[in-house]
């Protein structure tokens, strides 16, 4: 099994909140795709609550598109990490990490301004696979925590994992 890019960084020294350009690739037609690690919580120390993460997923996807999409840049997908410490965002185009951080900050402010559960997009049994598993209160707490801490830029080289030095193997 190949070692995935996300497992080549040392999670013990990764700061959060932070934006990390996790991967870039070219499509067969030459379009650039960037995958960003949007780390909300310091790995292995804290994680986002399940219901709040789900609500954030519904809100964050739209707000990030509002703030980041432009000519030559379009978000493909934003998905929560299984570890609940962040989201992965795939983008056509090459926004800078600072542009992503600015859009993320603006999105957190937008989320705080959502005042009612009824304002959460696609919150119904037809469009959501777990429509009862939401918490706007928890989403607000997550957004407030990000804004309070500030969003940094994470450099891949500074957190590169030396598998050999840590006694780890590639599987």
Curated annotation (Swiss-Prot):
Q: Which GO terms describe its molecular function?
A: iron ion binding; S-ribosylhomocysteine lyase activity
Cite the EC number. Answer: 4.4.1.21
What keyword terms does UniProt attach to this protein?
Autoinducer synthesis, Iron, Lyase, Metal-binding, Quorum sensing
Entry-linked InterPro entries: LuxS_sf (IPR037005), Metalloenz_LuxS/M16 (IPR011249), S-ribosylhomocysteinase (IPR003815)
Residues reported to bind Fe cation: 54, 58, 128
Q: Which GO terms describe its biological process?
A: quorum sensing
Catalyzed reactions = S-(5-deoxy-D-ribos-5-yl)-L-homocysteine = (S)-4,5-dihydroxypentane-2,3-dione + L-homocysteine
What NCBIfam families is this protein classified in? Answer: PRK02260.1-2 (NF002602)
Q: What quaternary arrangement does the UniProt entry report?
A: Homodimer.
| Protein name according to UniProt | S-ribosylhomocysteine lyase
Species of origin? Campylobacter curvus (strain 525.92)
Question: What gene, per UniProt, encodes this protein?
Answer: luxS
């Amino acid at each position: 099994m190949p070692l995935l890019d996300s497992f080549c960084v040392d999670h013990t020294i990764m700061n959060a909140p932070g934006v990390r350009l996790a991967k870039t690739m070219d499509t067969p037609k030459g379009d650039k795709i960037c995958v960003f690690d949007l780390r909300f919580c310091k790995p292995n120390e804290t994680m986002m609550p399940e219901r709040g993460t789900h609500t954030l997923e519904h809100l964050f996807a739209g707000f990030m598109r509002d703030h980041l999409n432009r000519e030559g840049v379009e978000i493909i997908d934003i998905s929560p990490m299984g570890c609940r410490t962040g989201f992965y965002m795939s983008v056509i185009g090459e926004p800078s990490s600072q542009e992503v951080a600015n859009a993320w900050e603006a999105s957190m402010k937008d989320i705080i301004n959502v005042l009612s559960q009824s304002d959460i997009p696609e919150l119904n049994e037809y469009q959501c696979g777990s429509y009862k598993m939401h918490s706007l209160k928890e989403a607000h707490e997550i957004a407030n925590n990000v804004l309070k801490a500030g969003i940094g830029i994470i450099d891949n080289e500074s957190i590169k994992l030396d598998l050999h030095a840590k006694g780890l193997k590639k599987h």
